[in-house]
UniProtKB/Swiss-Prot annotation:
Metabolic or biological pathway: Isoprenoid biosynthesis; isopentenyl diphosphate biosynthesis via DXP pathway; isopentenyl diphosphate from 1-deoxy-D-xylulose 5-phosphate: step 1/6
Entry protein name: 1-deoxy-D-xylulose 5-phosphate reductoisomerase
Species: Nostoc sp. (strain PCC 7120 / SAG 25.82 / UTEX 2576)
UniProt binding sites for 1-deoxy-D-xylulose 5-phosphate: 126, 152-153, 177, 200, 213, 218-219, 222
Role, per record: Catalyzes the NADPH-dependent rearrangement and reduction of 1-deoxy-D-xylulose-5-phosphate (DXP) to 2-C-methyl-D-erythritol 4-phosphate (MEP).
Superkingdom of the organism of origin: Bacteria
Residues reported in the UniProt entry to bind Mn(2+): 151, 153, 222
Needed co-factor(s): Mg(2+); Mn(2+)
GO molecular function, one term: manganese ion binding
Pfam families hit by this protein: DXP_redisom_C, DXP_reductoisom, DXPR_C
InterPro entries: DXP_reductoisomerase, DXP_reductoisomerase_C, DXP_reductoisomerase_N, DXPR_C, DXPR_C_sf, NAD(P)-bd_dom_sf
Length: 399
């Protein structure tokens, strides 16, 4: 039976890899809806290839260009523009599963719309749970939908948990490559350029998540996501540096057994599993050869080099609206870094300033409006914080 899929964030890294899977397995999957940010040319090509019933472009001013680019298609898909258009695509029609590939908190509202429409979620947008976990998880339960992780680490944990009885999980071990600077001395980080930060040693990803990998904020955010997905306390979720990125994460069980999921670093594998679960689909992809992979090594993360990791743990433990503030501040400050308006070491300093300013206003049981308000406040506060960085001491370590 062919599974019907809607994909939001279709022109990004997650989106294009998802469409690679759909094109490789047309007897398994079909596309109902597509939504993208601003890339008219790529979205038009995707519409021509996959013939969705509906499509949207978030940059509303580019809707006329999209309409013109596919004016010869027959039949014409429904074409929408703006954030409201993306939300409509997420809830539209008979799609069984919605893949959330939008980067950042922009994916929250489309994900909620899809859940409320009764659609299963292949979650590749970790910010949905990090910022919106207190709202999203009750909606998942209310509407009886499945929330399937589609990023490598949480997919690995999910796969390892198949067959583990309730209460059997003791600890989660999230593996991290260490990012672009895993072999750099801390002192060299003051010299980091944007080009340096975008040289990930193992994975092919978008610009924002590649910078997050370099700061290890990506792994810190994944700790918060794991807390929401699997229900463990933060003290039972650990990060370990694994430079080869062959073991994608591990779980420790109550009897001290440890289970791991292994594979080449290829995002298509967790995406395929999220789409095909509970089935396993044969692929002709390269098989893992442990002899070829060679040594698998592990080390503790350097807290001095990666202060963002500890900022994420602190925000997660604070709970409430604090993770939303952390996430929004990180998104905004990484964008400033990519635009070369701040230095690499300014990233954790700025995030810490913004989170500190939110402590007295942290909302313990936030509504969706509270989360969205905290998100917007944090983005504005980043602009103030960056102006004050010169007067703040540099972070050396966070205990």
């Amino acid at each position: 039976m062919v599974k019907s899929i809607t994909l939001v964030g279709s022109t990004g890294s997650i989106g294009t890899q998802t469409l690679d899977i759909v094109s490789q397995y047309p007897d398994q999957f079909r596309i109902v809806g597509l939504a993208a940010g601003s890339n008219v040319e790529m979205l038009a090509e995707q519409i021509r290839q996959f013939r969705p019933q509906i499509a949207a472009i978030s940059a509303a001013e580019k809707l006329p260009a999209l309409q013109a680019a596919i004016k010869d298609l027959d039949p014409q898909p429904i074409l929408l523009g703006g954030e409201a258009g993306v939300i409509e695509v997420a809830r539209y029609g008979d799609a069984e599963t919605v893949v959330t590939g939008i980067v950042g908190c922009a994916g929250l509202l489309p994900t909620i719309a899809a859940i409320e429409a009764g659609k299963d979620i292949a979650l590749a947008n970790k910010e949905t749970l990090i910022a919106g976990g207190p709202v999203v998880l009750p909606l998942v339960e209310k509407h009886g939908v499945k929330l399937l992780p589609a990023d490598s680490e949480h997919s690995a944990i999910f796969q390892c948990l198949q067959g583990v009885p309730k209460g059997g999980l003791k600890k989660i071990l999230l593996t991290a490559s260490g990012g672009a600077f895993r072999d750099w001395d801390v002192e060299r980080l003051a010299e980091v350029t944007v080009s340096d930060a975008l040289k990930h040693p193992n994975w092919s990803m978008g610009r924002k998540i590649t910078v997050d990998s370099a700061t290890l904020m990506n792994k810190g955010l994944e700790v918060i996501e794991a807390h929401f997905l699997f229900g463990l306390d933060y003290q039972d979720i650990e990060i370990v540096i694994h430079p080869q990125s062959i073991i994608h994460s591990l779980i420790e069980l109550q009897d001290t057994s440890v289970l791991a999921q292994l594979g080449w670093p290829d995002m298509r594998l967790p995406l395929l599993y999220a789409l095909s679960w509970p089935e396993r689909i044969y692929t002709d992809w390269e098989r893992l050869n442990l002899v070829k992979a060679g040594n698998l090594t592990f080390r503790e993360p350097d807290h001095q080099k990666y202060p963002c990791m500890q900022l994420a743990y602190a925000a997660g433990r604070a709970g409430g609206s604090m993770p939303a503030v952390l996430n929004a501040a990180n998104e905004q400050v990484v964008a400033l870094f990519l635009d070369e308006k701040i230095k690499f070491l300014d990233i954790p300093r700025c995030i810490e300033l913004v989170c500190d300013r939110h402590q007295n206003d942290n909302c313990a049981n936030p509504s969706l409006d509270d989360i969205l308000a905290a998100d917007q406040w944090a983005r504005q506060e980043v602009l103030t914080a960056t102006k004050n960085l010169a007067s703040q001491p540099q972070i050396i370590s966070v205990n």
